[in-house]
Curated annotation (Swiss-Prot):
Main subcellular location of this protein, as a coarse class: virion
Keyword Cell division among UniProt keywords: no
Compartments (UniProt record): Virion; Host nucleus
Underlying gene: TRX2
GO terms of molecular function: structural molecule activity
Protein name listed in UniProt: Triplex capsid protein 2
Amino acid sequence: MLADGFETDIAIPSGISRPDAAALQRCEGRVVFLPTIRRQLTLADVAHESFVSGGVSPDTLGLLLAYRRRFPAVITRVLPTRIVACPLDVGLTHAGTVNLRNTSPVDLCNGDPISLVPPVFEGQATDVRLDSLDLTLRFPVPLPSPLAREIVARLVARGIRDLNPSPRNPGGLPDLNVLYYNGSRLSLLADVQQLGPVNAELRSLVLNMVYSITEGTTIILTLIPRLFALSAQDGYVNALLQMQSVTREAAQLIHPEAPALMQDGERRLPLYEALVAWLTHAGQLGDTLALAPVVRVCTFDGAAVVRSGDMAPVIRYP
């Protein structure tokens, strides 16, 4: 690992047993979520029990929401009395790298942006139970961001279905639990039971969708006259509007001037300001369904593909 700046020391209680200490030694390269950026924290601050709210342990969507409020850090060293972790937000500089263990069932390729999701795959356990301390470490799974986006979309769809189950199909939907990535078949076994996280995701999703649809339709209707005029000279717009007519062919020869657009006039909103707002919210719709990438795989002189269980050198995501 190249030298970086900030590191967090996570204190290990003195009452830990030897088997539990040995289990911690195997956690190098895994990710924990820090509640705050500090030099000194305790193991209880990053354990799964710290995510419990009101005596209720969060389900998969609840963990996703909690991840957004915390700071990911990669465990770089495990010493007898403390764990050294590198916060990815402040500890990993643009010139530094850390080694991230690939605990996902898929390969990580050089250049892949990596997102973190809770354990969601069938037959995969990422928990480390420390019986002597009565604590559990539940590590997230690093996945390529495109795969993580699809998984989160499936989890939200399952949660929405649970909010309004169909009496005609009381069972589960098997299609939502199986997906394919790079030729591999992956089975999801996620815990989506609590309605609070589903309502939070659904509220953001519906508000963004309603805004994008209504404002996008208004902007398209406003731009239609100009699109028709541009179709006389632009083959792509021409095909888009399907103007296969003699009028189109004549217009291509005449080259009419496109009508000028007024910013205000009789319109409800200034056109270009509305277009900027719509593009911004359309991008936020994707951000609602996926965690942003935290790092990028960067293999300098090693293999370009990092297999499951191996260490992947990663750099800060730009």
